[in-house]
């Protein structure tokens, strides 16, 4: 039995496309927005499907303490707070390309968390 040449080239296996969620948190909003813009610019240069940045609610951590250390005197209070904004970026791409995108220089103080799931 002879095999016929159909003229078709063998089909190459496609690279698995994952849904990648990048979570960015920082205390400084300007540096957070700069890193978001850099990530999105890098993803669009590679022609990836990008969703975001999604602005999540800002966490506000509050501490209220008495000013006086001994407890005597007028009851005056200090109020301290720290705001932590959060951004989400969703990408649909192979994980190798995401390694290239996330290898950009990230501002100090910005935490990056990458979660990979099947598309």
Curated annotation (Swiss-Prot):
Q: Give residues for the crosslink Glycyl lysine isopeptide (Lys-Gly) (interchain with G-Cter in ubiquitin).
A: 4, 8
A Gene Ontology cellular component where this protein is annotated is:
cytoplasmic side of rough endoplasmic reticulum membrane
InterPro entries documented for this protein: Ribosomal_uS10 (IPR001848), Ribosomal_uS10_CS (IPR018268), Ribosomal_uS10_dom (IPR027486), Ribosomal_uS10_dom_sf (IPR036838), Ribosomal_uS10_euk/arc (IPR005729)
Positions of post-translational N6-succinyllysine modification: 8
- Keyword set, alphabetical order: Acetylation, Cytoplasm, Isopeptide bond, Phosphoprotein, Ribonucleoprotein, Ribosomal protein, Ubl conjugation
Gene3D superfamilies from the xrefs?
Ribosomal protein S10 domain
Sites bearing Phosphothreonine, chain numbering = 9
Q: Please give the chief subcellular localization of this protein.
A: cytoplasm
Regarding how it is modified after translation, the entry says: Polyubiquitinated by ZNF598 via 'Lys-63'-linked ubiquitin chains when a ribosome has stalled, initiating the ribosome quality control (RQC) pathway to degrade the potentially detrimental aberrant nascent polypeptide. Deubiquitinated by OTUD3 and USP21, antagonizing ZNF598 activity. Ufmylated by UFL1.
| Location of this chain's protein in the cell | Cytoplasm
Residues recorded with modification N6-acetyllysine = 34, 75
Q: Which domain of life is it from?
A: Eukaryota
Q: Which residues carry this modification: Phosphoserine?
A: 93
Q: Which family does it belong to?
A: Belongs to the universal ribosomal protein uS10 family.
Q: Which NCBIfam families match?
A: uS10_euk_arch (TIGR01046)
* Subunit: Component of the 40S small ribosomal subunit.
Function in brief? Component of the small ribosomal subunit. The ribosome is a large ribonucleoprotein complex responsible for the synthesis of proteins in the cell.
* Name of the protein described by the UniProt record: Small ribosomal subunit protein uS10
Protein species of origin: Sus scrofa (Pig)
